[in-house]
Amino acid sequence: MIKIAKTLFILLAITTSIHAQSLQDLVDRAAKTTLERFADKKLQESELSITLIDLRDSKHPVTASFHGNERIYPASVVKLFYLVAAHHWLEDKKIEQTPELTRALRDMIVDSSNEATQYVVDVLTHTTAGYELPPKEMEEWQYQRNAVNRYFSSLGYTNINVNQKTFCEDAYGRERVSRGPNGENRNKLTTDATARLMMEIVTGKIANPARTAAMMELLKREYTGQSSDPDNQGLGFTGIALKGREGIRLWSKAGWTSTTRHDVAYVEMPDGGKFVLATFTSQHANEREIIPTVARVVIDGLKEVK
């Protein structure tokens, strides 16, 4: 029996290794295809990050990435981290589920509202914006503001910074001081960390079933139809690659600024395919086809990955 168990373990390890290499080949192909397509736009390797998690066997997820551990300003994708932190705080009764918090969480994720996010960060960290503080008080303020960082660090997340509000224009006062004179304390995420968090949401690892369902409801996207908003989260990012394909379901959180365009998506295919795909781009915010180009290669190639 021991020999049989060892043999099965070795076979499983070999199979997993082959699967991982096939998935890595797919991600590399997606990156190569995208870089070649947008070569005339001068898209560089350093401006593209991709992480793919194959969830067809949700108990044994397999991950592959391209520049997946590069720290990038995440824009509104950081709101996914604040959503998870809020549900953890609520579960631990650190904060109360008030009507205003419910409204803010919805607007933060569904509408990507920066004002709602500012309120959520205040609630999570017990810090507020305002005039500059004396050094000692600012140090205490910053410690409180790092509460979300400490939470994700306790879960094993590394190489990220999630302690800043999102703004339509600019930060002032203590918010600007916190960010740093050169932006050295800005929010930073990697596609590896972002894809991992989305995976832990959709598989129910990060929260109980009720809270998982609540988060998934906010992340659910429609990718058919039309919108007057070119930055519609369902129609303007990964969802572009899903048009004309029937039976697909999409959950996502996008983010964009004048220089960045990002999306993290969970996709369920009618053939049983399930995957998380995080794609971050820098310096090409107006190139709306970069993210769906990556997604098309992944969708078409995943069925070949065994």
Label every PLM stretch briefly.
Residues 49-52, 75, 107, 119, ...:
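Structural recognition of the beta-strand scaffold that forms the well-ordered cores
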Residues 4-67, 90-95, 138, 142, ...:
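N-terminal leader/targeting segments and the immediately adjacent pre-domain N-terminus
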Residues 21-34, 42-47, 186, 190, ...:
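Structured C-terminal helix/loop/strand segments within mature extracytoplasmic catalytic/sensor domains
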Residues 53-56, 109-112, 120-124, 164-166, ...:
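Active-site-proximal beta-strand/loop segments in catalytic clefts of secreted hydrolases
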Residues 84-92, 122, 196-203, 300:
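Short glycine/serine- and small hydrophobic-enriched flexible loop segments
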Residues 73-95, 108, 277:
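Active-site SXXK
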Residues 88-106, 117, 208-212:
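Short, well-structured active-site flanking segments
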Residues 22-33, 45, 100-179, 187-192:
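Active-site-adjacent helix/loop patches that line small-molecule binding or acyl-intermediate pockets
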